[in-house]
Amino acid sequence: MGAEEEVQVTLAGGAPWGFRLQGGTEQRKPLQIRRRSQAGRAGLRERDQLLAINGVSCTNFSHASAMTLIDASGRQLVLTVRRVTDEGSVRSPSPGELQVLSPLSPLSPEPPGAPVSQALQPTSLRSPPDSEAYYGETDSDVDGPATQEKPRRTRRRGPARPSLPGAPPDEVYLSDSPAEPAPVKTGSPSQGDSRVSSPSWEEGAALQPPPAEALLLPHGPLRPGPHLIPMVGPVPHPVAEDLTTTYTQKAKQAKLQRAESLQEKSVKEARTKCRTIASLLTAAPNPHSKGVLMFKKRRQRAKKYTLVSFGAAAGTGTEEEDGIPPTSESELDEETFSDARSLTNQSDWDSPYLDMELARAGLGTAESQNSGLGGQLSEVSGRGVQLFEQQRQRVASSSQELAQVGPAAMLNGQSLQSPPRAQSAPPEAAVLPLSPLSVPAVSPTPFFPDGGAPIPAPSIFNRSARPFTPGLQGQRSGTTSVIFRPLAPKKVNEGLGSTSPAPSPFAAPPQGPTPLPSFTTVVPSHTPVSGASSSTQRSSGPVTATSSLYIPAPSRPVTPGGAPEPPTPPSAAAMTSTASIFLSTPLRNSARPEAPGPAVPEPASVREQRISVPAARTGILQEARRRGTRKQMFRPGKEETKNSPNPELLSLVQNLDEKPRAGGAESGPEEDALSLGAEACNFMQPLGGRSYKTLPQVSPKTPPPMAPKTPPPTTPKTPPPVAPKPGSRGLLDGLVNGSTPMVGIPEPPRLQGRGGELFAKRQSRADRYVVEATSGSSLNPGLRPRSPSPTPSLPPSWKYSPNIRAPPPIAYNPLLSPFFPQAARTLPNKAQSQGPRVTPKQGIKALDFMRHQPYQLKTAMFCFDEGSSTPGPTSGPPKTARVQEIRRFSTPAPQPTAEPLAPTVLVPRAATTLDEPIWRAELASTPVPNPDHQESLRSFAAAPSSCGFQVARPRFSATRTGLQAHVWRPGAGHQ
């Protein structure tokens, strides 16, 4: 048994003290230091028996009493311990202990002035107040010695700085006698400083005390890495505390980084980066920075559309479309990013919307019990159902307020409060009526104040397209209206007021002929078709040019009497997810013009319905782009080829049979561009050019409408339903691809039409062809004229150039464009100053020309010579300054005339060409005689040379390079 000594250890700094106790009277064992962590720096060792705490003897204390006494001590704890040392064993000394060799050893001279050490003489070891000894832990172990086998856990490190190897320990106050004598035999290994990473066990080495100047240093310098904490017993190497943990705990601490794949690491990094960005955007250091403001603006705008998951609109204060609403610091700021700077935010993104909607739950609670929709949704539970119910109540209440403000009109015996019930149904039954006026079929807006025409409801202004309507300047093209229909047919009948399938619920007045309904809503369930005539054409003149978008009701011919057939029931209509565009046929001359009534402002609930509910995604654009690569541009129409086409055209279309003719009712983007006008066919760039723009999903762009020629009473053709495209594809009353079949002329196949032929040819990349020098139809006017153009934008006798293209947009500087024609850039406009051309010149071989500029327009290559018979129209009037403002996609409103106008072609700015034919400008300046409209059409088509506004036939000419066409802009016809 070794010698015993009493050591007094002073710990300062406050709890935790950095050691553990075991034993006590309840275990019949003395209180013993079971384990010490940072308290070892003050000289405390394991297995030290506790004799006194702060001068109070604790030999008969229980464990709990000793811990209470230790906890009661304030900033300083004085422990008196008894230490038993084994004589023969080499131990690792405490780092704070100054070792003094035994005087029996010949190699250990006594330090000068040190008295002889005696056993059981207390040693006072004091550590400084800020050392690591006070940031360990002091916890109680009542479970006895069995806990000694428990694996060690890593302790919380304090902020104190560990020492370097060889550096002195923290301050040590030595008592009068040295610490316990450790006899070291000669030749036996002695241990150096226990903080050395690799301790030396050299033979005969004696422990030297640290230098005196090292004792004056309060702290050692910083040492990276874990410091070594000695253990008690015959351990040859001092082991660090970190090395005593088990492998399981080490793996948990390391979080098994070795098992993390590269993908998980990237996902983790991306998530951290996203959270950092989100926290910077929501809890930004500078909340007025541009990025934060843009984020908040877009988030406010996105809130209106992300609520479609449960069909509720954004807050009532968020009605403005572009600006940041007053509540720009939205609920997301408070809830989602309340803990924004901590990057472990897992809050529910839907909770702010739910709280926002539940806050309005008191709005019309009693009405929800009696509503038809509430009866349906009562069997289902969930957040979406609740929010649908609240939205329906809001719609009903807003419509009631509207009914109190406006006159209490009746719509087929049903009051204004009832239709909005049909608007808040689950979106599975939502149908998308596409109308430029955006009037839902069950909208509470239209009413008949004096038995007059239905009132159009003004809606959101679509800035990209306007109908060219003479009398509808106040009406604007709107976004898509979404009409909800409940799934059950009985609820639909209740919501729609038990309308019958055949008649329109908004009946026109019986004084005049029934106008065409603007759209027909096709419902997938057993709902009746309701067409609203609220957006029917109205003008001060009999001929109108409003273009309407129709939901598929393809078989809708107009009888020669002018009265249209009733809307087709849904059994006859095509139940497709796509929609067709029908250009509305103008009424006959005997039709009484209807003046539009005063517009009723649209309630906010209708706009909320449109915003909060997703438009039915038809996939029109995606299908068109997918088909555009493999489908031919035109429908073949082979069954109609009864007459043999021109040999001139046959020579140009020889290569068209390389691609298979695609049939069916579908259409691609090439056909979309074709229906913009024959000029637009020849400049379409592949799927991303200026002529084919990507349309928005929610509100399809209204096509650039063209005033159609008044058709003669012929047998109506019913084109199959096709996807909506920016042109007049499925025209009523026999309009085939935008052109009117003339009376007495058998209708040619749709592939006839020079622009269409050349465009299809260029689409198939068959660019090796030669334009004929002379054409039989131009030299011999007695021959039958060419077949009508695929589009009504140019007369049938007009010849197209394969290099024709559209002009650039308004904000486009053509002189800086690589596509701007060189001749137009360098040569003056001499087309007006030249005299009439009599003799046609030799045609140019397009191969030589297109090798250098394959798809650019050479304006000097046009020679406007019709022959000696028509010298007048070849030189157009000089260009005059434009008075009216020219906006993109819009032309000034035509002045309403009492007489039917001659075939006027209004093409928007994006569909015109740099070389617009001169006949269009001549229309604006030459007084047009007004014969019978149908007769003028027939004579215009049958005898081109006898007509007052005959069109020149441009041809290729390699030598006449100084000619340039008259450029027509959209305001040319209305000055």
Swiss-Prot record:
Main location: cytoplasm
Modified residues (Omega-N-methylarginine): R383, R463, R466, R476, R754, R805, R825, R888, R909, R920, R953, R955
PROSITE patterns given in the database record: PDZ (PS50106)
Keyword terms, alphabetized: Actin-binding, Cytoplasm, Cytoskeleton, Methylation, Phosphoprotein
Residues with the Phosphoserine modification: 105, 108, 140, 163, 175, 177, 342, 347, 371, 378, 381, 667, 675, 787, 789, 890
Subcellular location: Cytoplasm, Cytoskeleton
Pfam family, one: PDZ
Protein's UniProt keywords contain rRNA-binding: no
Gene Ontology BP term (one): positive regulation of stress fiber assembly
Biased composition, class Pro residues, residue ranges: 502-516, 701-724
Region (Disordered), start-end ranges: 18-41, 86-214, 314-349, 491-649, 687-731, 772-797
Positions of the PDZ domain: 6-85
Protein family per UniProt: Belongs to the synaptopodin family.
Function per UniProt: Actin-associated protein that may play a role in modulating actin-based shape.
UniProt cross-references to PANTHER family, sorted A to Z: PUTATIVE-RELATED, SYNAPTOPODIN 2-LIKE PROTEIN
Record protein name field: Synaptopodin 2-like protein
Organism of this sequence: Mus musculus (Mouse)
Lineage: Eukaryota, Metazoa, Chordata, Craniata, Vertebrata
